[in-house]
Amino acid sequence: MSLPFHRLQRWNGQFYEVISLQDLGFTLNLGHNGDVCPLSTGDDKHSDQITVVDSAGIFVHSVRWCRCDGDEDKHLQLLRHRLFPSTISRPQTAFSFNVLDEFLIDSLECKTSASSFYSKLRRLTDNAFPDTLPVCFRILL
């Protein structure tokens, strides 16, 4: 999938409701150009759930790692897909390169703090209930 960080809405008969790609069963496959790793069984055993912060908002995705011999560490697989992991050992949060570039420009030109920038992303994701989203701005620093 080429656009994993788009916000979706689905008509439920009365109104459009927000729905995630994860709700639709989407899993972000790392390695093999987005295809499932041949050594993966396709079950949840080889996947993790991570929070991805993008300039379009905050998303939770299932991620299936490449398991081939000589496969890269998880943090390197994320970097190859232009996602900067929050930690090297067990990444549970990642920031897209786009959001990092946007934060850099906002902080240099507008003097935006990490807290304010992250609050903006929370509002973009859910303007009605931004406090229901995870707080990751300290990781952004």
Residue ranges of predicted features:
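Hydrophobic core positions in small helical hairpin nucleic-acid-binding modules
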Residues: M1-L141
